[in-house]
Structures are given as C-alpha cells and as structure tokens.
Amino acid sequence: MKTSPSPEHKFITEPQYLELCKACDQILRAQDSTAERVAISWLHVIREHPAFLPKYVAIFESRQNLQLFFQLKARPVINYGKFLFRLGKTLISRVPNFHVLNISSKPYDVVFVSHLLNRSHIGRLNDFYFGEVPNELAMRGLSVAIIFINHTEASARSIQDAWRGSSVTRIVLNKSLSFPAEFALHQRAAQESQRLTTLRKSLMPALLRRIVARSAAEALESSTLTNMRIASQIRTLIAHLRPKVVVSTHEGHAFERVAFAAARESMPEVCCVAHQHSALFRLQHSIRRNLSAPYNPDFILASGVISQSQLKNAPELRHIPIMVFGSTRILKPTGGIKQTPTASMFATHKSKNNCLVVPEYDWSECDTLFEFSLECALALPNINFVWRLHPLISFKSLLKRNRRLRARTPNIELSDRTLEEDIGRCQLALYRGTTAVVQAVMGGLTPIYLQMRGEMTIDPLYEIEKGKFIVRTPKEFAEMIGTPRDTINGATEQDRAELVDYCSRFYVPMDFQVLEKIIRDAPERAQANTAERNPEPPSPF
C-alpha cells in the first residue's frame, strides 16, 4: 500500500510552477491575444494542487515523450471527431431556447452566474454558492435572476420547473447551440489554434515554444468550446435582462473571465462582481493576476477576512476594490459541537479517540488520504478513523474504483452523517487540501496535515505554523498520537487560540447588504467605470 508518490509519478517543482505561470500569462497578455485565447482553460494556471498539475508535466520533459506527442498530434484528431459528433446531434435534435420562469420585461438589478453541481440542489431555496443572498435581495424589492451552468444530466425544463413560483428568475444554459452557432465556435477556435501555431515558430525559448504548441492543441479542446459556448449565451442573456450588476463565482477559471467580457460587450456599463468562494492557497495564481480590462472584475467579494487580506496583498489586484462578503461554508452548530471556539478545545477529555478523515472532491485525493489512514488503522487499532466523502462522491463508486480500500479494518467507519455531526464526535482531523479543516478547527479538532514527498504544500492553513501537526508517514502519525495535545509543535495555549481565531475569520456569514450597496450605487458608477476602462477591441462573444 502506497503512502508516498510512486516512482513513476512526476511532480512539478516550485520553480517550474512559477515559470509555467509566467509563460502562460505572457501568452494571455500578448498584444495579439483574443477572446478565444482567453477561453483556453489550460492557460489559466489555477493553483499548485496535484489535481491541477499533471496536465502540465509533459512540457517540462527534455525529450518529447508519448504524453506530449498524444496531446499535440493525436488529441486534435479526437477533438475533431467530438466536434463532428456534437455537430451531428444539433442536426437531429432541436436545440431548445432558454426555458425561463418568471422573467421580467424590465431591466434586472442583478444577475448571478452560479452552478448546478448535483440533482439534489435542484429546487432548493438557497443557492449552493450564494446562499440566501438572491432571495434576500428579492425580498428587498430588487429584481434578481440566476443563470445556472448545468453540470448535471437534468434537462433545463425539469430544473426550472422545480422553482416555479419563485420570486427569483432562473435560467439554465444550454449544453449545445444551433448548428450554425456550433460551427462558428469551432471555426473561431480553429483560427486561434492556427494563430498560436504560427506564433510558436517565432519564439526562441524551448519551454515557451512547447507551451504555445500545447495551447494551440488546447484551443480545440471541448473545455475551450464550452467556455466559448457559455460566453455566447451570457452575451445573449445580458442583452435581454439588462442588469446593473453581474455577479459570478470566482476561482480563476477561463469561463469566469470570458463571461465578464461577454457581459460587457452586451452592456459596456454593467458592473462585474467576482465572488471568491474557495480557499486561497499559497501559490494560487490565476485569481491573483490581472488580465486586460474586459476580463477583470470591478469588485471582488471575499469569503472572509483572511482571503480579503490575501487578495489585497496580490500586487496585480491593487486597483480592484476587495470587500468581505462571506461564504455559505459556515459551520452550523449542533448539540455535538462545542459552541464557543477557545483554546481549551484542544484538550482531550473524551475517552474515545476518533480521527475524522476528510479528502477533497477529487478521486486521487480520496485514494491518498484513505489509503494512508488504512495503514494507520492497521498499526493503531485503538484509534477510530471516520472516513468522510465530499457530497458529490459516494462510497459505492469509490470502493468500486479502488479495490484496495475494500480491505477495511473494524476501526474504520464510512460516515453518512453531516459534517457537523462528524466534527462533534471526533478529536482529530486528517486532511490535505480541503477547507473542511477550517470547520474542524472551529469544532475543536486538532488538525493533522498529510504532506506527500516531492510536492508543494496544499495546506489551506499554510499561514499558520503552530497548533497543527504535519505528518508524512504512518510512523509519524503514530508518534503524533502519543504526543500530548498541549505540546503540538511546541505551541502554547495562546498559539492554539490564535489558530482558532484565524479559522473564525476564514469564512464569515454572508452579508447581502455589501452586494446591495454595489447594486444601489451602480447607476452612478457605471458611466465613470466605462470611461476609466482602457479602450480595447470588444470581445467577439
């Protein structure tokens, strides 16, 4: 059972990562850059997470390996086949118009761009990303719409019928456009691919040439066309809804940038607001960097005081107002959770040692943490390990995929309880990149970060040095178990209190009044914002 990277697994080093970020930004910011280029997801380096980096490993190889050859030569052929298949589907099945409920003929005050990740989210009163804010604004007399990017297999009609009678308009984007529109998208992507191929011939540094060559192939990827498709529909909808403000989730993805550009093409005076909803990691990149004016937000709404500070420290964002807005990821107290976060939470006064194991929404991260904890469970039968999954992953699918995890020991439990209930019965939290550790610390658990050899840290608590454990092997985990909780890394009671305080500022409750003020002030600011933006060619979306 592996608890460290296999020999054939290759990591990108930190210097390589920084070089990659710089090169991709150079391509995106080039004078000949187009909206199609900005739509290439591969050029937007999100962060240093192992789940994001494998697709970049091949470009750092000294010799052209099989993976790079596949990406540059075989992949375009596959993508062209997918394009023909999608084009054929548009001929035999009519693409529906937007199925809209409760649409107003008057201009809207605010339009949210959100996501439907799971069928269970359909019909819920509160939005997964924006919580009760859309409803609160509607109750205060503002006209509100939510545009959904649909990640489920449910039809737009069935999704929107679930909200029939709601005071908030809901619109689901189509996954396909008409035959002419799909053909036009592919033609534009192909033209950008050709431009990048031509650009490659004029470049000298070998790494930059490889990145441009890969970008030329990525221009024809389905992810690029999906981003362009989203932008095309956003442009149409914004022209119809005519909102004062557009609010989108913001993590640094390409579709967020082209959505802003598309909205501004339809309404140059619209105010674009970005909601930073995910944790920021040490080397998180694309959310912290500036592109040309059409693609940048006018405001950034931070999920907490910590992320506001981290974003304000980004040199390229100094011209953008950054305000604390809040997050839906607030721990909901239950009877099993300690109500007042204090340093005494770290004391172990329960007779049962339960360790909560919380991976991210990523298969490889589930494998890493669960396989590691399985080894620990074999060595430490007195410790109970509570395996918890992201809501979008099931144990049935996980165990079907990874047979090694079927050999569980009696001291491993597959949890079907809420996060709050699991936190309330555990004393330890084994984690890697998940922000659930923030709620765990607030609930009194001792955080234990699993660091894999050869990789950059993905610890969301990277700014904190004391009050947590860092382990690399099951042996180190066992040694940690024998360490009194009041001597964590030499931390004092004050250090542990500061960790709890840090986590209390990581996410804060959402304050709809922050956004309401932006909406109310939008008419006065619109003319000034339009004039201040650098005059650039409009987006073709």
Model-derived regions: residue spans:
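Catalytic-core helical/loop segments in enzymes performing group transfer/polymerization on anionic/lipid-linked
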Residues: M1-F541
